[in-house]
């Protein structure tokens, strides 16, 4: 569990440092969560990773998304566009209900 959590936190920080907007989209997090993830120290990352609970979630929770990601592969560019479009609807929580 620790390895998976630490890998997620490390990847999250790298994505957010590289391109914050793209990282937020790929991680499916809000600006507040992105800022908190980017600001974590190594000790804080270790503490979170050691919590004994998975701190990330797989987003393809709808059959259509999972099916689109696993079907016979059409041209690579089309796969990337379709995947981005399918995940875009799941990327950020509905902020109107917050």
Swiss-Prot record:
Molecular function GO terms recorded: DNA binding
Predominant cellular place of this UniProt entry's protein: cytoplasm
Transcription regulation among keywords: yes
One term under GO cellular component: cytoplasm
Cellular location(s): Cytoplasm
Biological process according to GO: bacterial-type flagellum assembly; positive regulation of DNA-templated transcription; regulation of bacterial-type flagellum assembly
Keyword Glycoprotein tagged: no
Record keywords, A-Z: Activator, Bacterial flagellum biogenesis, Cytoplasm, Disulfide bond, DNA-binding, Transcription, Transcription regulation
Described purpose of this protein according to its UniProt entry: Functions in complex with FlhC as a master transcriptional regulator that regulates transcription of several flagellar and non-flagellar operons by binding to their promoter region. Activates expression of class 2 flagellar genes, including fliA, which is a flagellum-specific sigma factor that turns on the class 3 genes. Also regulates genes whose products function in a variety of physiological pathways.
Oligomer status and interactors: Homodimer; disulfide-linked. Forms a heterohexamer composed of two FlhC and four FlhD subunits. Each FlhC binds a FlhD dimer, forming a heterotrimer, and a hexamer assembles by dimerization of two heterotrimers.
Entry comment, domain topic: The C-terminal region contains a putative helix-turn-helix (HTH) motif, suggesting that this region may bind DNA.
Family: Belongs to the FlhD family.
Name this protein carries in UniProt: Flagellar transcriptional regulator FlhD
Organism: Burkholderia lata (strain ATCC 17760 / DSM 23089 / LMG 22485 / NCIMB 9086 / R18194 / 383)
Gene (name only): flhD
């Amino acid at each position: 569990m620790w390895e998976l959590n630490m890998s997620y936190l490390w990847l999250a920080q790298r994505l957010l440092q590289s391109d914050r907007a793209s990282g937020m989209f790929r991680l499916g997090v809000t600006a507040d969560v992105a800022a908190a993830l980017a600001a974590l120290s190594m000790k804080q990352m270790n503490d979170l990773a050691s919590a004994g609970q998975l701190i990330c979630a797989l987003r393809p929770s709808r059959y259509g998304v999972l099916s689109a990601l696993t079907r016979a592969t059409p041209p690579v560019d089309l796969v990337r566009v379709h995947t981005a479009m399918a995940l875009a609807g799941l990327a950020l929580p509905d902020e109107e209900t917050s």
